[in-house]
């Protein structure tokens, strides 16, 4: 794998990164198994991977929004503009246009955000 990046500083001084990765194998027609090697929409097992669990809980959970928080900034016309919560998905799939729908198993794992238990349906890949 090869990577190239640039970091810009926005008007308020916050960094903004642009990243590009070149993978050494042919990725022109990705398969679900290839996608699963690099992208995950699952909460890690807190006993097997406590650091991964903590990082996903802190940085990769959307919301809550929808009926759990109708005043969330992402809400437009009573629905989440980002499509959360996403439906559970047993396997990663790719539609005819090449759009991937990521695996989101209903495995009982959750992240507690205030009074809400957020499952894999709320993970931002």
Annotate each PLM feature.
Residues 1-125:
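Extended, structured polyanion-binding interfaces
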């Amino acid at each position: 794998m090869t990577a190239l990046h640039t970091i810009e500083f926005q008007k308020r001084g916050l960094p903004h990164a642009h990243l590009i990765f070149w993978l050494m194998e042919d990725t022109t027609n990705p398969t679900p198994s290839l996608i699963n090697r690099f992208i995950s929409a699952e909460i890690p097992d807190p006993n097997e991977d406590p650091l991964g669990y903590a990082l996903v809980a802190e940085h990769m959970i959307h919301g809550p929004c929808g009926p759990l928080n109708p005043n969330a900034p992402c809400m437009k016309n009573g629905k989440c503009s980002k499509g959360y919560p996403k439906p559970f998905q047993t396997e990663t799939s790719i539609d005819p246009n090449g759009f991937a729908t990521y695996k989101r198993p209903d495995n009982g794992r959750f992240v507690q955000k205030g009074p809400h238990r957020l499952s894999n349906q709320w993970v931002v890949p």
